[in-house]
């Protein structure tokens, strides 16, 4: 079973046509204004300005986090998908200008990350666990694929492939390479998509390497010791990474507590988990890997039978934005991140491709109509990052999810 391309499906009327129009006409332009810091009353993005600085066009200072680039990449992916639905010359022109910035910011060896280029260039590849270099790369790859499909233009695809090649030179089984894997999973699923588009086997092999290595060594602990146990976020020495914002051991939080083929129960940060499971299921589909697929089946069954809310959302605690334990589904403290619901759809679609059974299609529909749509306001300008099942107006701390 293969997915139809977005451009091969035309929605002409009804419920989903209204949502499609909302995305095309309101959400994408509004997010463009946010990325350009034109919307008052919200935290500034500076994402585009960061690329202007990195490209040598602006003398301003970097603003944001190590993962700031990913916001722009997600917008570019949305634009690429939108252009597969209908032509929009003005939108395409804006995207092309952004892609020129990406090209100018990319380093000679393919490396591309504005935070590490502008703020801590000496620390590139030194904190894979916390700093999202590989996560951002994954979102760039997905954006490049979508934009290539939407326009036929390959400039951003060449940028993405150059970055993927840079990563391939840095990570792998060879003795002189780093024997690690992404702290925040995302790159793995993107590499499989890149293989599907380019038919370059090296991208599939790199995705396999990241999945196969996870949980088999002490890479994250070793790099933690090398940086003298300093946390990126607090700049202070800590006993364990990530403990600042979650209650779980970081091995489970980051899903490297076991090799992936031994993992049978969903645990840790929900978005990281389902992104990884998506890549696992996609690799199983490509390679006929029964052992990997068996693990995916156990993980999917665990989530859908024991760790999912009635509305199809996942992640029952804001502490680590995470899964907790079987049947622990409180309504007053759940997190239910919108990204996690989308990731669960990605995972479930790959399971549908593998098994071709209606339970997977039904689950996609169930999550889409409930846990995903709840994250987007009907005006296209208001969003829920997390989706509380229950919230008292006087509980200001719960309002932080809006």
Located regions from the model:
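Glycan-recognition and catalytic cores of secretory/periplasmic carbohydrate-active enzymes
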Residues: 1-402
């Amino acid at each position: 079973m293969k997915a139809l391309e977005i451009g091969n499906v035309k929605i002409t009327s009804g419920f989903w046509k209204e949502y499609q129009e909302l995305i095309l006409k309101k959400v994408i332009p509004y997010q463009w204004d946010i990325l350009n810091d034109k919307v008052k009353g919200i935290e500034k993005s500076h994402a585009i300005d960061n690329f202007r600085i990195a490209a040598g066009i602006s003398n301003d200072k970097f603003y944001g986090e190590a993962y700031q680039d990913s916001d722009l990449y997600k917008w570019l992916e949305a634009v690429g998908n939108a252009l597969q639905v209908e032509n929009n010359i003005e939108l395409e022109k804006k995207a092309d200008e952004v892609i020129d910035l990406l090209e100018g910011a990319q380093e000679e060896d393919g490396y591309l990350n504005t935070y590490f280029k502008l703020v801590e260039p000496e620390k590139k590849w030194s904190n894979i666990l916390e700093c999202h270099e590989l996560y951002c790369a994954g979102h760039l790859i997905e954006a490049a694929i979508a934009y290539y499909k939407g326009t036929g233009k390959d400039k951003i695809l060449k940028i993405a492939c150059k970055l993927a090649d840079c990563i391939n030179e840095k990570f792998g089984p060879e003795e002189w390479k780093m024997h690690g894997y992404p702290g925040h999973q995302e790159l793995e699923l993107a590499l499989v998509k890149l293989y599907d588009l380019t038919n370059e086997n090296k991208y599939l092999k790199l995705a396999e390497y990241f999945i196969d290595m996870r949980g088999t060594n002490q890479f994250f602990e070793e790099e933690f010791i090398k940086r003298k146990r300093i946390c990126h976020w607090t700049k202070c020495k800590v006993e364990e990474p990530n403990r600042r914002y979650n209650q779980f051991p970081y091995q489970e939080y980051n899903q490297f507590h076991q090799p992936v083929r031994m993992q049978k129960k969903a645990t840790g940060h929900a978005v990281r988990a389902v992104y990884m499971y998506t890549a696992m299921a996609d690799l199983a589909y490509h390679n006929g890997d029964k052992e990997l697929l068996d693990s995916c089946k156990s993980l999917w069954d665990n989530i859908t039978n024991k760790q999912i809310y009635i509305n199809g959302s996942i992640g029952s605690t804001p502490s680590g934005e995470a899964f907790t334990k079987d049947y622990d589904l409180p309504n007053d403290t759940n997190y239910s991140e919108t990204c996690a619901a989308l990731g669960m759809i990605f995972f479930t679609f790959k399971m549908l491709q593998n098994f071709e059974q209606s339970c997977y299609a039904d689950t996609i529909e169930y999550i889409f109509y409930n846990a995903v749509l709840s994250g987007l306001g009907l005006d296209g300008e208001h969003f829920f990052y997390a989706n509380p099942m229950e919230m008292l107006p006087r509980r200001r701390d719960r309002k932080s999810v809006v």
